[in-house]
Amino acid sequence: MLIALSVMLAVFAALMIFRQVHSSRQKAVAEIVAERLHVSDLEKYVDSEYSGRYVDAILCEELKSSMLDVYNRVCDVEKRSRILMSHNPSIAKFKYDFENLDGIVDAHNNRFKDDKLREHKAFFDTVLAYPLDDQQRRSIVSEEQNCLVVSSAGSGKTSSIVGKVEYLIQKKHIRPERILLISYTHKAAAELTERMPHPGLRGYTFHKLALDIISAQSKCKPSICDNTDAVFVRIYRELAHNADYRKCLVEYFADYSDLMELDEDEKSKNVRRLQLGESAGRQYCALFPDMDGNEVHVRSGEEKKICFLLTSLGVDFRYEEPYEHQVADECHVQYRPDFSIHYTDGGKPCRLYLEHFGVDEHGMVPTWFAKDRGLSYEEANERYNDGITWKREVHKKFGTRLIELSSADFAYEKARQRLKRELVAAGVPIREVQSDELFDRILPENSMREKVFIRLTATFATLLKTSCRSMADVAADVAQRGDKRSRFIVGKVLEPVVVRYNEILRSEGKVDFTDLIVGATALCNANGGGNYDCIIVDEFQDISMDRYNFLLALRRGNPQAQLYCVGDDWQSIYRFSGSDMNLFCHFDQYFGKTDLNKIETTYRFGNPLVEKSAAFIQRNPAQIRKNIHPFSSDAKTEIVFREYRRGDAVGAIERIVAEIPLGKSVFLLGRYTYDDYLLAKNFRQRRSGNSLFYTVCGREVEFLTMHRSKGLEADYVVLLNCNNGSFGFPSTIADDPVLGFVMSDSDGYLFGEERRLFYVAMTRAKVQ
């Protein structure tokens, strides 16, 4: 027992000695590491080393690199020696600061901005005719490599740009020729130049800048094809003489053009749903009239195809004509078969009925039938099939002839073959219309349908370039997605247009406007970029992929040029022209570390419009959050909704205009130029340049489309035709889905672009 106790005491003593030695070793190693640290307090170091300087992304990375070796050594010693150094204040402080260096730099830069704002207060108070606000000033003194200024309607973004330029020239002593100003229109670029008449400073559009770069570096000014619309009309006319292409167009309109007629809500649902079944209303317009010459509106894409097939087979029909016998009872309304086919047999008028049933080869309805009707799938399937049975029994009872097509038949050729076989068996005379005649009937020369189709081809070819994609890229995407419709339209309908368009430009030695940007980008990349210290871009929410690549090339240099980009994602309304809102909303992902500044005071309008318009647009989670407020709590801008009876739109406009005080400016805004049709029929018109005026109640008011009104303002703004419909607002005209291969991704919010356009239209008003 005594020996065992002695051993235990010896072990305990040894452990105590080991702990003391280990603790001393920990302390000694930590002290050695601490002594070798040249910097332990990075906060003080940054403020001292960069006193009076802005630490931009490049400097921040250099600072991290210079400290990284020391940080790694500390971590390595801890790991290999199993020595915890956090008890040493110097080491603990260094590690914490290094791991939070971005925050330290941001705090330093904010203090830098505060100092500059105090130092240059008099400048910001007087550089314009009115003092710049705090948010505008803060964005101007930023010296980050990438500065994004998120503006708001009427927030003075142009004032911010002018203030930035004057600050760079007067306070940073940057030569005017080293500052590049870019806007989207010639008018805006000219206005910027006029407001800042410094020798060497000039506002450009992207296209004008690209043209000048190519001309200067190649010593040859490019010939620009400035009427591409005419080129696409010419291409269509050429291709329309090709029998194979004409056949493809007939197939396109017969079998694939359905989705162009649907609004975003419908199109966002299952595409199979749109093609198969019945909609609540008649949303599809058949290509040809019925036997009486009446336009036919049907309930599904497949019924639209049946209309085409009947016409192409030379068969007379009416859609949903009442059944020839009275069959309405307590459970059923009067029966209206989908199609009533009329023909003569031996001089005797005959009628045959055709029903389209939305069931598959197993007699099962699509799953969405149940959801739309609030039923279980079994109930929906049973009810629909009960309806089929009832219709068959009606025809059996009265001895009338019924032929049937189902959704299972709708591969185009399969449906045609079956329908033709059934009609022939029933004794219906077939007078097949030739492909050329069908083409001429589908696309009469100068018809609206022809114009819309040519516009589709032009839009696709243009967006293909602005998205910096090739036909090979699109073909790969189409192959991956694997749907028959896209393969057919891209490969058979659109690619021949793109190929011919590029052939014409090459053969005539011309370029289009997108070619200018692509060509100038290549030259800048090859020759080291532009010679600029700062590039300022207005209306940045309209940026497209080709312009983005151009900016990257322009800023290349040693050092690279700073970017100061100003725009409002709430007013991004040009996706159809190639703009990509992602480049704005995710700016830092494309350009790198970014100093984001918001200017949220609107000087144009007041409440309740400020609060209501902001709440409206921010329902879309894709939009950047802002706290918009009017410059004065006394500023008031009312929103008034006026109902009018159908047919009384002119009277409603007259009553509204008559209430507006004389001397106040008035805009009439329409979603489409089509909206001025009613005005032109009822009011005297006057044109002045590109402006259009109407005399209403003895005073002149200006008509603009909502897109054209962007950037403008009036005391009173009247939004016309705010009715749901194809040409209403929001517009339910949908783009063909194939444009999705060349357009930027939608923000995914229902009517997202239409909502932004509505915001633009609302915020033109100062009073009401």
Question: Where are these predicted regions, by residue range?
Answer:
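P-loop NTPase Walker
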Residues: 19-225, 759-763
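Conserved helicase NTPase motor core
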Residues: 95-153, 202, 281-282, 289-292, ...
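Conserved P-loop NTPase-based nucleic-acid remodeling module centered on helicase motor cores
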Residues: 37-45, 49, 53, 178, ...
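Conserved helicase C-terminal RecA-like lobe
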Residues: 661-665, 709-768
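Helicase P-loop NTPase motor core
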Residues: 148, 154, 158-161, 282, ...
